[in-house]
Amino acid sequence: MASVASARWLRVSCGLCVPLTARRAGPCGRTPSSRFYSGSAAVPKDEGADIAGTEEVVIPKKKTWDKVAVLQALASTVHRDTTAAPYAFQDDPYLIPTSSVESHSFLLAKKSGENAAKFIINSYPKYFQKDIAEPHIPCLMPEYFEPQIEEISEAALQERIKLKKVKASVDIFDQLLQAGTTVSLETTNSLLDLLCYYGNQEPSTNYNFQQHEQTEELEEAEEGDNMKSKKKAGHQLGVTWRARNHAERIFALMPEKNAHSYCTMIRGMVKHRAHTQALSMYTELLNNRLRADVHTFNSLIEATALVVNAKFEEKWNNILDLLKQMVAQNVKPNLQTFNTILKCLRRFYAFGKLPALQTFREMKAIGIEPSLATYHHIIQLFYQHESPSKGSSLIIYDIMDEITGKTFSPKDPDDDMFFQSAMRVCSSLRDLELAYQVHGLLNTGDNRKFIGPDPRRNFYYSKFFSLLCLMEQIDVTLKWYKDLIPSVFFPHSQTLIDLLQALDVANRLEMIPQIWKDSKEYGHTFRSDLKEEILMLMARDQHPPELQAAFADCAADIKSTYESQDARQTASEWPANSLNYIAILFLRAGRTQEAWKMLGLFRKHNKIPRNELLNEFMDSAKASSSPAQAVEVVKLANSFSLPICEGLTQRLTADFTLSQEQKEALGDLTALTSDSESDSDSDTSKDK
């Protein structure tokens, strides 16, 4: 089998260069030679066949179970409680978050507490010597960071390297050289490993956590077409390779260098963005007739793609040259090799599509099983824009047909990016069936572990639920709403707006008060766009009296959010639309006193009322036989010089019996209106 795989890999020099013309453009075309079947069970041809030659089944005397097998069996019998908060937030009921902001703060506080506990344990290890865990859990015990060997020796150097003391390790190495002591090649390589991994700087206590966060920011910046975010994310990575640093100095002082020494330097340079220096170091490695390992080749492929001022053809040819050198040096590629190539091809946009398909086919031809990160890179390459074009690729359907029903295990750091990118494509294509297929894959086996951290999980479910609101029947959408929110994720205000629009299409507006109640619970009390959407839907049409009363109560609650001012939140300014909608809802529910109070807010906040609102106020005044209220409506329209003022005045004189005082007031308003119109006409004639 190894010889067959090597023979297949030898075709890389030509297989990746020939354009595909007669084969399908999808990445999942199955090749018979790339299929592998397990031969663990022999099936007899028929019942009468001779079974003497069949394989004998051997029953093992003892079955070795995993230490957590019982826990796994118990966990498989328990399903998610849709009414409970996520497991990470199950603490004191008062502390359970109710919004995405609070959940993020909760997780940060929890991580801060863990770091504080580790600091105390490691600072005072003598008080934490009792080990009560069975089996032993190393991460719960103190870590000893203080060196025990005081004299200057190679053993002391090895101890400080193990403790990740960068500066102390370099100092002892220099002292050993000054004393004329020869440091072994193995120890020197270990020191190079330390320096190249941390970029010649002391690692912080939460180095791994910071690296994970910074890598996520850089990945999100690459996926978005935003140059500012790319520069910001790249700047935050901080550590860059500096010329003539400790690693280069120690490497130059080494009397003997092996392949490990060169490979460590190359990988350190690539990690800290010294791509040109890494390629030069590889040339030096070849000149010394040494061979690089597969991990070094993976780093060199990345460095080749990131070299500035080089065109696509040049970069791709250089990558192919590296692959040919792998064949010449008898270095077999691994999954990371192909994933690195696909990730680099994403930088080439449309030029990288055909090489990506060729790379994927070659990958499967030599028997390497793709991971979720492989499909993620292909999706990101073929669907780089949010809105689908007229000739969008259908490759996402081939991918889902290939992997539906499969259970994946972690193989690549980017595996947890797949579901986010796949659901983004489903949303852009407006394909609900495909979204269900992706969600079904997520719930297959332990694939849920690849949903990613909290921001990616929220992105995935927000896209999924928004697509449900757009394409699914309202009853099914509401079932998903109860199942996912808030037990799985906390909705953004736009998610709730999508749900409101789905309720509007299905004529289920009676649920709007409940949606507003949920919005307050999820921390969207001060979201003006959400409140305006709710008010608009309630005020757009006439409804039965019971529903109008519920809408008026909801409008009064929304009105209180504009009037109140929390200690942490400045009061929102009154939008004109919200004033109009709330006043209309009060009028239709028969809450006339509250509605007439809204007229004063128009003057107070200098907002112009709509003509429909003024007409409804006139209807309300007529229904209550109140000419005084009608006069107030005319005064309000006149104060804003609205064109409808003349029509309202005519309605006032025709529909109401006015007192002498009211007639005089109305005459004054008419005179002021005519004077203002004559002044405007004279100004217009002068301009002419």
UniProtKB/Swiss-Prot annotation:
PROSITE patterns in the record: PPR (PS51375)
UniProtKB keywords: Acetylation, Mitochondrion, Repeat, Ribonucleoprotein, Ribosomal protein, RNA-binding, rRNA-binding, Transit peptide, Translation regulation
Lineage top rank: taxon: Eukaryota
Modified residues (N6-acetyllysine): K126
InterPro entries from the UniProt entry: Pentatricopeptide_rpt, PTCD3, Rib_mS39_PPR, TPR-like_helical_dom_sf
Gene3D superfamilies for the chain: Tetratricopeptide repeat domain
First and last residues of the transit peptide: 1-37
Protein location: Mitochondrion
Signal sequence coordinates: none
Keyword Repeat: yes
GO BP terms, alphabetized: mitochondrial translation; regulation of translation
PPR repeat boundaries on the chain: 149-183, 184-219, 258-292, 293-333, 334-370, 371-412, 415-449, 457-491, 492-526, 575-609
Keyword Methyltransferase part of the UniProt annotation: no
Molecular-function GO term, any one: rRNA binding
Stretches the record annotates as Disordered: 667-688
GO cellular component: mitochondrial inner membrane; mitochondrion; ribonucleoprotein complex; ribosome
One Pfam family linked to the record: Rib_mS39_PPR
Family annotation (PANTHER family): PENTATRICOPEPTIDE REPEAT DOMAIN-CONTAINING PROTEIN 3, SMALL RIBOSOMAL SUBUNIT PROTEIN MS39
Family listed: Belongs to the mitochondrion-specific ribosomal protein mS39 family.
Protein's job: Mitochondrial RNA-binding protein that has a role in mitochondrial translation.
Protein name: Small ribosomal subunit protein mS39
Source organism of the structure: Bos taurus (Bovine)
Encoding gene (name): PTCD3
